[in-house]
Amino acid sequence: MAGTVRTACLLVAMLLGLGCLGQAQPPPPPDATCHQVRSFFQRLQPGLKWVPETPVPGSDLQVCLPKGPTCCSRKMEEKYQLTARLNMEQLLQSASMELKFLIIQNAAVFQEAFEIVVRHAKNYTNAMFKNNYPSLTPQAFEFVGEFFTDVSLYILGSDINVDDMVNELFDSLFPVIYTQMMNPGLPESVLDINECLRGARRDLKVFGSFPKLIMTQVSKSLQVTRIFLQALNLGIEVINTTDHLKFSKDCGRMLTRMWYCSYCQGLMMVKPCGGYCNVVMQGCMAGVVEIDKYWREYILSLEELVNGMYRIYDMENVLLGLFSTIHDSIQYVQKNGGKLTTTIGKLCAHSQQRQYRSAYYPEDLFIDKKVLKVARVEHEETLSSRRRELIQKLKSFISFYSALPGYICSHSPVAENDTLCWNGQELVERYSQKAARNGMKNQFNLHELKMKGPEPVVSQIIDKLKHINQLLRTMSVPKGKVVDKSLDEEGLESGDCGDDEDECIGSSGDGMMKVKNQLRFLAELAYDLDVDDAPGNKQHGNQKDNEITTSHSVGNMPSPLKILISVAIYVACFFSWCTDLPCPCLCCPAAPCGPPT
């Protein structure tokens, strides 16, 4: 009997023990066959041979360190790291797409627009010679063409001295003026005095102070224009550099842990914690964020430069009014023609000896200090307004680099409220670690992210930003300092134009001249007067007549001539002379053509 009781007790104990053991066993893994992981990995990276069919210990893993059986292999881990870095590069490029397009578009627009301004300035000058000094053509056309070619090259960065450009123009013009206008009847035997005349031009100051005035205006406006273009091109380089950064292995491991290690546990639908994403991104992009300080300074310095680009610091105003100043300089020569002819006749006639260098300069050769006058002009949508619009758009990106980590996290799948999310190791109810800020100066408590200095390419781009910022500050015009005192003393009246006006160019002749700025930006329209189609160039061939007469003003033509240019990059140039200038050639083809005399 006692044996039977003991046997029964043992049976009961065994049953209870089995029950307890059953309760102590851990729950089975979410995907005991790794089927979901295999399906996902196949879509991400073809290669099912690397995915285990059932969970494995994963002792060889280095990033997705398992707390139990895992559906990841070492080869899968490597593929995840590669994919994570590629994803990061794509997110970074997506973040900068709008900014990059903004700068590229405007750099192309302004470069083309500056070329259009130069081309029109050349046309105006040629037309002025044709209508006022026909005896000087075509020699004058050649000299004017060479001058404006040098202007274009200078804007694009060529190492050309502006003073030399202007001196060469007047050195070349004076022999033609002297032999064709002042002494048209000179015999052939004395026409070989060009070198003597070129030298006499400077020593006798036959054009008065107009060459110096042009040097000052052209030099200041072109220097600012060139640095403006250089700054835009550097902005493109900065964006391109950060767009194509190669992230470190440490960063790749952290990105993999954040985006893909949850898959190894079969947690396919779990999102990374938002706070965890911020920490990882600030660590990965610590070097990039170091650009922020210099990027902010770049935009603010560019704004300061743009704010000073008016009057003599605006190449649009200076070049489009250059024909008027050249016209005035020739009038000055004519006004003093008698005395100049006498003096130069003694120095250069029948002689190649350079005795003129010690010649007496008559004191009564003078410059009329009120020859140049300035008038208000009608406001148009000019290069100046376009520049200001660009600056306003750029300022919306002034925090671009400091905001990059947050931007990328906001554009990738994360749990924004940090609840039921992946913290890099496991699924948690709430993530509590605070994201670090301010680039590399903070430690992240993430041993995987080793704090190093910026990548060499980032250091190089920072150095370039420092350099361009220094140039921008150097070239920026202090507020209120627009016209040099020396210019006022030489006859440039500056009182007629306010600081906010876009157009201030010289007059021609004795009276005030109201000039409408010729260059406008239109959304989809482009009207461009070709160099050879300048109103004064008809003597070069009647074959251009049809092209000239088909050009109309806005007021007279039913619909403007439309020229579609490359996507999102447009340059529009439009002429409307009818109401303001004596020569309404574009509005009234029958009228004499050319700018005012």
UniProtKB/Swiss-Prot annotation:
O-glycosylated; contains heparan sulfate and/or chondroitin sulfate. The gene is Gpc3. It comes from the Eukaryota. It is a lipid-anchor; GPI-anchor. InterPro entries: Glypican, Glypican_CS. Glycans are attached at residues 123, 240, 417, 494, 508. The modification Pyrrolidone carboxylic acid is found at residue 25. The modification Phosphoserine is found at residue 351. Residues 533-553 are annotated as: Disordered. Disulfide bonds join 34-71, 64-261, 72-264, 196-348, 251-284, 273-421, 277-409. GO terms for cellular component: cell surface; lysosome; plasma membrane; side of membrane. The keyword Glycoprotein applies. This is Glypican-3. One of its GO terms (biological process) is regulation of growth. Residues 1-24 form the signal peptide. Its main location: membrane. Keywords: Cell membrane, Disulfide bond, Glycoprotein, GPI-anchor, Heparan sulfate, Lipoprotein, Membrane, Phosphoprotein, Protease inhibitor, Proteoglycan, Pyrrolidone carboxylic acid, Signal. Cell surface proteoglycan. Negatively regulates the hedgehog signaling pathway when attached via the GPI-anchor to the cell surface by competing with the hedgehog receptor PTC1 for binding to hedgehog proteins. Binding to the hedgehog protein SHH triggers internalization of the complex by endocytosis and its subsequent lysosomal degradation. Positively regulates the canonical Wnt signaling pathway by binding to the Wnt receptor Frizzled and stimulating the binding of the Frizzled receptor to Wnt ligands. Positively regulates the non-canonical Wnt signaling pathway. It is found in: Cell membrane. Belongs to the glypican family.
